[in-house]
Design a protein with these regions (language model features):
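Transmembrane beta-strands of outer-membrane beta-barrel proteins
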Residues: 52-58, 94-96, 155, 193-195, ...
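Transmembrane beta-strands of outer-membrane beta-barrel pores
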Residues: 60-64, 98-104, 150-152, 159-164, ...
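N-terminal periplasmic/intermembrane-space "pro-region" immediately following the signal or transit peptide
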Residues: 2, 6-72, 83-86
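Outer-membrane beta-barrel "beta-signal"
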Residues: 456-470
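Outer membrane beta-barrel
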Residues: 85-116, 131-211, 248-254, 333-337
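Solvent-exposed loop/turn segments connecting transmembrane beta-strands
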Residues: 69-73, 138, 169-176, 200-204, ...
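Residues on the lipid-exposed face of transmembrane beta-strands in outer-membrane beta-barrel proteins
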Residues: 80-86, 144-148, 182-186, 244-248, ...
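Outer-membrane beta-barrel translocator/channel fold
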Residues: 103-110, 194-241, 283-355, 362, ...
Length: 470
């Protein structure tokens, strides 16, 4: 198994500074972790490891879902992890982290819902979606990398965290999505440039590491454009993902972004986005976004029943927003349009939508011929570490039975979000609390079929999250 090997490698890195033999006499105190004496010579490797940084994270996540005509589904997850990063030596440093998750209590997450015959969607995502029966052995080696950093250049090789428009953390569960590969960054005061090659993914709600093609299809696969179940899981071929990007500062508080994602043998996505940033002297802001997608070869498999991106389709997305900061408040209106030429496709295993109209709890990936209208408001307290985020959106989707434009058979819906965050101070410094509630209301025909509304619409969802960082 690869997993034990990776943990062995991580252990080697953490213990590399030990000089003691591992054999212990039976009458000796255990010395497996070596001596604790601080090394004074800053030129050697031992000093660099001893002067490294350690970050700890404890997390509690309660989740419950209220579906129409159904019992409440719930889960309480708890977990913790450690991250270590050595002090640089010749501009090189090493990082490693791991995390465990435990199912403290939950409703039945193993058997399909009795009305829709589908597995739980939200609560199961706190654990391992590939093994719903696993409640205790949920652990993952998350980061294991070597990093070169000098002046404005950073190059990271190995398992790492990445946050870009197309591949991102999507950290709305216990643990985020992680990637493996090489990632380089150049940053100066106004501009940032990125480039990398990725060949492994460990998606949110999983514990293993998967090759690029294997990682696509771990989540729900939806349907083909003719309405038959998509068959691309374990049927795709791809060597990896090439990702490049740039963020360039323009005059008068404007920023433009360019991103291109090349998924070998499957599809290519390009994004251009320009944003005017708010300032005290100019509190108004706006943004424009365009995304284009084209199929590569046969979309991953020449068999149309097993392809990820059907060769007959392409997609174009246009987005816009306009907002104003007013004292402690920030208000915006947002719009997204996906054209009729095809579905906007992006493996959900790799991250959330980059659209201005994204609201926590749902995505529009897999849709074509979509119009989304969203209002967002944010309140930041002056004298308290308190943020309140609110959102309301109308998502005009194609009919559920228009399979060519509606991959997951989702009804048009209204969504209402409330997200409250508080960072404790004083004695409780390090603790953070978050309360989330959203409700989705179907506004078009669900054909009285539970599989079209269970965990999709006519439902509410509640989260209470506690984090302790140390």
């Amino acid at each position: 198994m690869i997993k034990p090997l990776l943990f062995s490698m991580a252990s080697f890195i953490l213990l590399i500074s030990q000089a003691n033999a591992q054999h212990q006499e039976l009458n000796e105190d255990p010395k497996l972790w070596g001596k604790s004496k601080k090394e004074l010579d800053s030129a050697n490797l031992l000093y660099r490891f001893q002067m490294g940084t350690v970050h700890g994270h404890l997390r509690s996540f309660y989740s419950s879902t209220f579906n129409k005509n159904s019992q409440v589904e719930y889960a309480q997850a708890i977990g913790g992890g450690i991250q270590f990063k050595s002090k640089p030596l010749y501009n090189l440093s090493i990082g490693v982290s791991g995390f465990f998750v435990y199912d403290a209590i939950s409703s039945d997450l193993i058997n399909p819902h009795p009305l829709s015959n589908t597995l739980n969607r939200y609560e199961l995502g706190l654990f391992d979606i590939t093994d719903p029966a696993n409640k205790t052995d949920i652990d993952r080696l998350e980061e294991l990398y070597i990093q070169y950093q000098k002046n404005k250049v950073t190059i990271t090789i190995g398992k790492q965290l990445l946050n870009t428009p197309f591949i991102n953390l999507q950290d709305g569960r216990m643990r985020p999505t992680e990637v493996q590969g090489i990632w380089s960054q150049y940053r100066n005061k106004e501009n940032k440039f990125y480039a990398g090659w990725l060949n492994r993914f460990s998606p949110r709600s999983t514990v293993e590491w998967y090759k690029t093609a294997e990682s696509i299809g771990l989540y729900s696969v939806g349907v083909n454009i003719d309405g038959t179940k998509s068959g691309y899981k374990d049927a795709l071929e791809s060597k990896g993902v090439a990702l490049v990007g740039a963020e360039i500062g323009l005059i008068k508080n404007h920023k433009i972004q360019f991103w291109n994602q090349y998924v070998d043998n499957i599809f290519n996505s390009s994004l251009v986005q320009i944003d005017k940033l708010p300032k005290a002297s100019s509190p108004y802001y706006y943004g424009l976004q365009m995304i284009g997608q084209l199929v590569l070869n046969q979309g991953g498999n020449p068999d149309p029943t097993k392809t990820y991106f059907n060769p007959s389709q392409s997609s174009f997305v246009f987005g816009a927003r306009f907002g104003r900061q007013l004292g402690q408040w920030d208000h915006s209106i947002n719009f997204t349009r996906i054209n009729k030429q095809g579905r906007y496709l992006m493996p959900r295993e790799w991250g959330r939508d980059p659209f201005y109209t994204f609201l926590l709890g749902e995505r529009n990936e897999g849709m074509g011929d979509l119009n989304a209208y969203v209002m967002k408001s944010k309140f930041t307290a002056k004298h308290l570490p308190l943020n309140v985020n609110m959102g309301m959106g109308y998502y005009d989707l194609p009919d559920i039975l228009n399979f060519a434009m509606n991959k997951y058979s989702f009804p048009a819906y209204m969504q209402y979000n409330l997200d409250v965050r508080y960072a404790f101070t004083g004695f409780w410094k390090g603790w953070e609390a978050q309360v989330i509630y959203f409700y989705k209301d179907a506004v078009e025909n669900t054909y009285n079929n539970p599989k079209y509304y269970i965990n999709k619409a006519d439902m509410g969802h509640f989260n209470f999250i506690l984090n302790f960082h140390f």
